[in-house]
């Protein structure tokens, strides 16, 4: 099952005349093509619709008011993720790899700053979760969480590249599974090059570039905050 924002009325403003529709992926005319990422991994797909017919019962909300539904869901997509704990765990992993690689105090200081930022983000997320449990909505906090979480995640992939150095260069897809985890390569494959910790570094760096684009680019999130909070 997927959802789709479909144009049902073109007479008003662009955000009007949109309907939120659920579509069964087994419906005749639905085609799914893989999107190969710059890392060589298959993580996302492109969906095409060829004369697809969907029953009216699949409309969520009211016809022509789908943008309202979409905005509500986007708040939770942007602000419902718990970036903090995952990013703190990644910092811990990078600390261990950095120690093994013998990096200097500058890298350790940058990792400490990243850990502090992840802890601050986690605290903000916990505050928002408390508000959500009381029946609130993410609101503008969702935009802030999305910006902070994705940009800190990207910063950690950059630090990982620096720590790995030249060991991050070899492309070794046969040593990873679709989830990006390091696995034993099939019989006859080339031997692992470099430390295991460096195998997925480049792929994660490349894939994480999308973080500041999906769910509304970070530039758009800053515009939302500037308009609502600063009146710009």
Predicted stretch roles:
Residues 1-3, 20, 47-48, 67-69, ...:
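Tryptophan-centric aromatic hotspots in well-structured domains and transmembrane helices
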Residues 24, 29-122, 211, 227:
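Glycine-rich beta->alpha junctions and the first turn(s) of the following alpha-helix
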Residues 69-76, 81-84, 167-232:
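Glycine-rich phosphate/cofactor-binding loops in nucleotide/flavin-utilizing enzymes
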Residues 10-12, 36-43, 195-196, 215:
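Short Gly/Pro-enriched turn/cap motifs at secondary-structure boundaries
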Residues 1-33:
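A short core secondary-structure module
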Residues 73, 93-97, 127, 131, ...:
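Generic, well-ordered alpha-helical scaffold segments in large soluble proteins
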Residues 105-108, 119-186:
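C-terminal helix-coil-helix/basic helical segment that borders enzyme active sites and/or dimer interfaces
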Residues 13-17, 61, 217-218:
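Short glycine/proline-enriched turns and hinge-like loops at secondary-structure junctions
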């Amino acid at each position: 099952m997927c959802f789709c924002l479909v144009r049902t009325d073109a007479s008003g403003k662009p955000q009007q005349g949109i309907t939120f529709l659920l579509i069964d992926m087994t419906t005749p005319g639905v085609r799914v093509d893989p999107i190969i990422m710059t890392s060589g991994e298959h993580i996302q797909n492109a969906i095409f619709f060829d004369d697809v017919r969907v029953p009216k019962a699949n409309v969520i909300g009211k016809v022509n008011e789908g943008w309202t539904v979409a905005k509500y869901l986007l708040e939770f997509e942007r602000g419902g993720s718990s970036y903090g704990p995952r990013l703190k765990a990644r910092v811990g992993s990078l600390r261990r790899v950095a120690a093994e690689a013998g990096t200097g105090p500058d890298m350790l200081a940058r990792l400490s700053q990243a850990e502090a930022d992840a802890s601050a983000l986690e605290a903000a997320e916990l505050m928002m979760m408390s508000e959500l449990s009381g029946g609130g909505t993410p609101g503008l906090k969702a935009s802030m969480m999305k910006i902070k979480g994705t940009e800190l995640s990207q910063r950690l992939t950059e630090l990982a590249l620096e720590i790995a150095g030249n060991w991050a260069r070899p492309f070794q897809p046969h040593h990873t599974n679709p989830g990006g985890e390091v696995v034993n390569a099939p019989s006859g494959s080339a031997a692992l090059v470099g430390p295991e910790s460096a195998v997925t570094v480049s792929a994660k760096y490349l894939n994480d570039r999308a973080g500041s684009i999906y769910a509304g680019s970070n530039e758009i999130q800053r515009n939302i905050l500037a308009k609502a909070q600063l009146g710009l």
